[in-house]
Amino acid sequence: MNINENYSGFTLNRIREVPDLKGKLYEFTHHKTNAKLNWIQTTDTNKTFSITFKTLPFDDTGVFHILEHSVLNGSKKYRTREPFVDLLKHSMQTFLNAMTYPDKTVYPVSSRNDKDFMNLMSVYMDAVFNPAIYENKNIFLQEGWRYEIHDEKEVPKFNGVVLNEMKGVFSDVYSNIFDEMFRQLYPSNSYQYVSGGDPKAIPDLTYEKFLETHKKFYHPSNARVILDGNVDIEAVLKFIDEEYFSHYEKGESFTIENQEVLPARTSTIEIEIAPEDSPENRSYISFGKILGHFYELKKKIAMSIVHSILVGTNEAPLKKAILESGLAQDVDYSLETELQQPFSILMLVNTEEEHLEKIKEVIRFVTKDYHFDPKELEASINGMEFHYREKSEPAGLLNSLHSLETWLYDGDPIDGIQLSSIFNELREEISTSYFEEMMKEFYDDEEHWVTVIAKPSKTIAKRRDEAEQARLLADQANWESARPYIEEQLALEAWQTTPDTKEQLDTMPKLSLSDVQSKVILFPTEEISYRGTRVLIHPSDPSGIVHFNLYFSLAGLPKDRLSEVAFFARQLLGNLATENYSLSALTSEIKNVIPVLSTGVTCFTPYNRTDGTQPFLEITASTLEKNVDQAIALVQEILFKTKFEKEFVLNLLKQSNESIRQSLVNSGHQYALLRAKAHTSAEGVFNEYTRGITYGAYLQSLEDHFEEDWEGFLEAIQNNISVIFSQDRFILSIAGIEKEKFEDFIFGLNTVKANGTVVHYPLLQDEKEALQISGGVSYTGVAAKMETYDPCFQVLAHLVTYDFLWTEVRVKNGAYGTGMRSNRLGFNTFSYRDPNPIVSLEVNQKIADYLRDFVKKPETENDLNIIGTIATMEPLMNYRSQVKTGDTLVLSSIDDHIRQAERERLLAMKKEDYLALADQVEEALKHRFQVVIGNEEAVSKLDGYKKLSIKE
């Protein structure tokens, strides 16, 4: 391709090398509309397409968020009710989603398959430019908001997918703080508004304004298209021009007015806590400030380094001073860089409003004359550069988003994907006062801080519900008649329950089974014995990064000790000082030597076993080949020489408990599933005791009784070290490292013998359990055991998720998310941010009948579900994930013959197979286990449920 030449209406303006991606950047402009299109040419066979619109909110109704959901519900060319879901069901997509940001809406897709890639791009282009929203108001009512009413005598309810999603978001402490920070930092431009929508304001959005907003902003002149990978660029340009851009004239483009940095001001908001929680020390105090402009990439990276060194660990100087003063339980920071004017936040967790001035005094004292250690700066830069260079997936999407960080605001699109020179510049600044100046720009500029104080309230949820109810009554009082709203609701339900016709289904692009790779992806792993140790050897990473995983069996450890070991492994190892390193020095050394280091627990269940599992403590590490010896030595230091000092352990414990509290509100479905699955398999029990509600209850009890339990806890930890880290329990996994490098490590382990590897944990027994949390929505988790495993259950679960549950739980019931999962241990279902958990649980009883009805559909429908299922089984993975997958297969005794046989079983599946599967599902659901995590109103409606609690 040649610069200044025209390609299907696009002029090629510039071609530049992108060495960091081993590729080139091609920049095009569409002549007729001035639309911008860039192609990041790489050898990546996973091809990515995204189209982005600059969408600038003008109120809190969440109109752009609702549009993001709505345009994917049918279009001029693709006439089914939900083409987005059809693609999830039937394509070979490796990424398929849409995202609303404070100033843009992004529609990305990717696929390894050329035909599929063009199909995905076509559906998305038609969705954004020719959506069915203009002819079908039901889409707005379903995805946005509506009055739900069936009888003139009843009080209506608000319902809608986005409305319920945002009720869940508004239950999150951090979301509330960030929304208020946006309001206070940017009072003069569009960033002041909640782009996702405030639940109080969403019902203010009219259908007419919704359509008007789409017409105004969804135009090629306001679009940025990015392609990434080994794309047939001329075919793509021809398609985009002929099918879409050529039909438009030049339209409006939009700019964001820069916000003047204003004098300091303080705002107070309320955050919800559970009725049984004490409000003492449950406030949050956050300081925020605008930091320059989007094009100051060096400053953004430098500020991240400054924050990391000052508050990144409990022994970082500023965080340590605040913790030791007792002014807060935790200190965190955030950099919001995907904005025209980035900003930074320093957040103090679990504090009191009255501590505000003392906190400022501590910040002044620590930062006034602080000078950064050159070695610590070097380590931080090295660590950040390692993460930048290590390929993450989905790489094409990440490249696109990084490029948009500058390009969206008419900056240079190459800046966000070519950062090597910036890391070199930062190294040169180590010997100057640059980092101290960056510190002062934020920490010593109180006169421009926005301070947000979030105070706990036990009544805000009740007041919020009462306000919504009062509004509904007021709205109803102003109606001349309820009949139009009842008819609107009935029409919506009729549309939701009407299956797509054959004519509608035929409009969707389709693949055939012949397009699917019949062979499974292999993860070559050689298993040998070295110095009496089981060693798994993987091929070297082409990038030159080396990886090692260490596994120590936890067999023989009583079930009641699992939570203790999980806390020890996940929160203490690597987060405490050691005999030879202070925590700050250890953190610096980790960044320098092992930029990727994680410690925790995991388990591997032998093939076709549910009664037992193999539990392990695991250490995962990635580094450069030149640092291998230092990395191994550092891991030894962490495992055997960590100093378990009472005060520092307590700080980590409190922070862990706060994290779990927030996770229960934000991701309650994960905890519901963990609990439910603990009733069906030994693996489920292990995960519940190491990550679930039981784990949370253990940590809370340990904090509540810390003084009296400390000596016993410390003794148990020391005993764990002497028992767990033994040669007999050790398995080594390596990629790109000689096994001999670990000889000293192996001989440094103790010689305590282990008894077996498979553990049979007793299953939980209660069929129905519930946990009450604060928040506006609820979550469910259901688990059931299968007598025999058939790989076809994977297809069944895929179908049920994207057809039956999507329609019944998300579309009709208004839950933000739902799904069914199946593996060798059984199957489970869940709902997420669910306004009516009882309804969602009842839906499960209809799965078997739905499957029997599915048999009446054409065989091609079954083929499409097989295609979609296989796509989900082969996600994009970076090399580190490939190594971990290889370990999992070996340690679960699943060889390539088993995997290939299962693939062939899937490809041979016929729709009649659903009849036998339906019978098994129906029988299994008779003995299901249900868990609900929800607010007070939802839990109070449950009958026959055992009440759970994190607290004693």
What are these regions (language model features)?
Residues 61-73, 562, 566-570:
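Active-site recognition of the HExxH zinc-binding catalytic motif
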Residues 149-222, 226-244, 248-274, 279-281, ...:
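Hydrophobic, small-residue-rich alpha-helical packing segments that form membrane-like cores
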Residues 159, 211-243, 691-692, 713-746:
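Non-catalytic, conformational "gating/processing" segments within enzyme and secreted inhibitor domains
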Residues 430-470:
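Extended, domain-scale alpha-helical bundle/helix-rich regions
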Residues 46-56, 82-130, 136-148, 175-200, ...:
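M16 family metallopeptidases and their MPP-like homologs
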Residues 41-43, 50-52, 163, 167, ...:
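His/Glu-based metal-binding/catalytic segments typifying zinc-dependent metallopeptidases
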Residues 95, 211-215, 272-275, 332-336, ...:
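Generic recognition of flexible, low-complexity loop/linker segments
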Residues 1-48:
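Non-catalytic terminal extensions that flank enzyme cores
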